[in-house]
């Protein structure tokens, strides 16, 4: 399952299908409890349905649906990764700044939201949402990349739904071609911050599935566009 997820995040569409196909035909082990078999069949069916993705977006949707199916199984059978997420900690930037901090934050968010779906565990999901909704964007950091405002905690109440983030300054626009990449990055970071707000507000597994699919699609699109090799 994680192989398909990581392929989407890396922007490697050609690697997603084989990973999903392999999962769809993997037989259960001899010690698999009988009451797990219907759920295993559901997981394999979900993997098989997404085994021939035509776009990265479709691949991400299949991976997110698979994560949701895993979570349903773990919830019903009380299995899965046990208390793996019980000790989920909040994201901390430590001494990182700039691109290194952003990538560490994105990686933390993707992993925490994944655990929130697959275990499933609200604490992990909330930690991932909080990291995303506090992404540092131009105008909210000083010249050294340090935050100018305190992080927002997850609301858990729906207070932010449909409301523009009041802390975001006016969006930067590229006046000349050399500034285009800067403006594009600004816009991408704002979109991810808004996605964190949606993750914070997600209350159903379907909503969480859609948010996660959108997140890893954005990750994969960006990594593919800049030619970053994560393998």
Model-derived regions: residue spans:
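Sequence context surrounding c-type heme c attachment/ligation sites in exported
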Residues: 1-231
């Amino acid at each position: 399952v994680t192989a398909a997820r990581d392929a989407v995040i890396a922007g490697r569409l050609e690697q997603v299908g084989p990973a999903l196909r392999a999962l769809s035909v993997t037989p259960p082990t001899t010690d698999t409890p009988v009451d797990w078999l219907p759920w295993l069949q559901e997981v394999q069916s979900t993997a098989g349905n997404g085994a021939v993705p035509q776009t990265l977006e479709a691949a991400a949707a299949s991976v997110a649906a698979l994560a949701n199916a895993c979570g349903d199984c773990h919830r019903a059978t009380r299995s899965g990764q046990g208390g793996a997420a019980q000790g989920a900690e909040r994201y901390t930037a430590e001494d990182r700044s700039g691109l290194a901090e952003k990538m560490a934050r994105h990686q933390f968010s993707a992993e925490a939201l994944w655990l929130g779906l697959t275990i499933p565990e609200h604490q992990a999901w909330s930690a991932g949402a909080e990291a995303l909704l506090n992404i540092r964007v131009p105008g909210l950091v000083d010249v050294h990349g340090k935050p100018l405002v305190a992080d927002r905690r997850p609301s858990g109440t729906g207070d932010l739904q449909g409301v523009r983030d009041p802390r975001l300054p006016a969006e930067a626009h590229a006046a000349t071609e050399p500034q285009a990449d800067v403006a594009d990055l600004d816009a991408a970071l704002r979109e991810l911050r808004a996605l964190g707000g949606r993750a914070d507000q997600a209350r159903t597994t379907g909503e969480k599935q859609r948010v996660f699919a959108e997140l890893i699609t954005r990750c994969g699109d960006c990594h593919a566009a800049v030619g970053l090799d994560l393998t």
